[in-house]
Amino acid sequence: MESVAAGSPSVGASLSSSSSTVLQLLLPMVVLVYVVVQTVVRRRMNTCTAPLPPGPMPWPVVGNLPEMLLSCKPAFRWIHHVMERTGTGIACVKLGGVHVVAITCPNIALLKMQDTNFASRPLTFASETFSRGYMAAIMAPYGDQWRKMRRVLTSEIVCPSRHKWLHDKRADEANNLTRYVYNLAGAGSGGAVVDVRHVARHYCGNVVRRLVFGTRYFGEPQADGGPGPLEVQHVDAAFASLGLVYAFCVSDYLPWLLGLDLDGHQKMIREANEMMTRLPGVLIDDRWRQWKSGEKQGLEDLLDVLITLEDAEAKPVLTIEEVKALSQDITLVAMDNPSNAVEWALAEMVNSPETLKKAGEEIDGVVGRDRLVQESDIPRLNYLKACIREAFRLHPVVPFNVPHVALADATVAGYHIPRGSHVILSRIGLGRNPAVWDDPLCFDPDRHVPADPTADVTLTENDLRFISFSTGRRSCIAASLGTAMSVMLFAGVLLEEAGRDGGRRPQRVEARHFHGKAAGAARRATAAVALLLGYLYVIHRP
């Protein structure tokens, strides 16, 4: 579930607001080093037989940062605008001294062809903060620590046996989801409006807390099955963190600005991280003490697994700081992708009543009306999975995937990719590429339904026609968990006879394409559900 935010419009806006101050500091430096940099660039280009990917001519030292800051657009929009001007599936902009190579063409499958060379991550203030100094796996640069943590995750946390071991906890949260929505809907008279974003995000938060910490609540349990104040704080901090990491902050490309915090980016990161780590930290410290004192014996959740891991010499594999870092990694990657996909799928399906009808008919045929959806039903819920795939394609949770760093010079699609370049795959560009998809802005789940009715629809996309859980050496390794969470969330909401005959027609939802929330902002249309006369509907909420 590689879905860590890469390019936040909210952060982009704050960068634009401080552009004048930044430029006043930068321009004198530009003049001083212009000749030196030009000489170095010419020598560098003379040693390369292949050209850089097309893109705007950079300024010395600052690269294309002035254009990005003065564009008054979020960084991800500006980069996509540059790619539209070049008219190619690959483009290069230079931010400070870093070449940022954006790709929208699935045929340029560099992560398959040169996987190891692009297996590292950028070193940024946000990634260092959220990973506790690169102790975990997702944001760590390629090296021994990443290999160690990746090995722990693959062999102990997301392996098939562990997935099966945690089944009952996931099932409890799926059942609680249905109960919570029912309680919310019954709270009003004549039908109630239920915020799908709120429900979806907190379902994901509940699942993560149950799997990792063995509890749904940090504080007092709530009678309706919903989150309490502490749980709301934790989930809000998680989504704030996801919106800040890899957000094209100026100081990530001009390290000598680090500490000035001209745009307030560093302050926001520290605050989000403190809120993100405070509550889990108390649980982890207490659990660590219980195991070391012999007070606790049996394994009950993933935290127990991490604490008790031992090597061949019976020595602990992980320190307490590494346990905290991995716990935060798991929390961040598991929350946003399923909730975003389900929210957008519901919003789009309201505009296409036929899709709601087909989804309801599939649930009737597979599940029936006398029980709730179970994970064992997932292989047969192909149309529901097709709807989720289409949401992943058309409405990705973030504009770009997590950046890959080139460990050595490389040639991709005939272009030179210098060592240290940040390579970003555009989730928007891939999923909406008209050369790959017919009518790419149309929500059409049937495009994912195979002609063979016995074939299985999966949420993964190995051909990079769109990105759900990513691919390659740095791909998400928890696709099974991501699939289970996405389908159970989607089916759990649809189970209340969504859009079936006999009820009132739902209102239309305006599905805006990244006119707001792309990595954390909330300006787009928000879907909500209403229980009216016993039927579930999705309606527009401004």
Residue ranges and their predicted role:
Residues 102-106, 177, 211-212, 279-284, ...:
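Hydrophobic, repeat-rich solenoid/adaptor surfaces of innate immune receptors and signaling proteins
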Residues 122-130, 164-342, 358, 375:
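Cytochrome P450 heme-thiolate monooxygenase catalytic core
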Residues 2-15, 24, 53, 83, ...:
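Cytochrome P450 proximal C-terminal region
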Residues 337-355, 360-362, 480-496:
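Cytochrome P450 catalytic-core helices
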Residues 65-87, 278, 353, 372-414, ...:
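Conserved cytochrome P450 K-helix E-x-x-R motif and the immediately C-terminal K′/meander segment
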Residues 19-21, 48-53, 68-72, 158-167, ...:
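Conserved, non-catalytic sequence blocks in retroelement Pol enzymes and Pol-derived host proteins
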Residues 2-131, 139, 144, 148, ...:
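N-terminal membrane-proximal hinge/A-helix region immediately C-terminal to the signal-anchor transmembrane segment
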Residues 425-457:
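Conserved cytochrome P450 K-helix/beta-meander segment immediately N-terminal to the heme-binding cysteine loop
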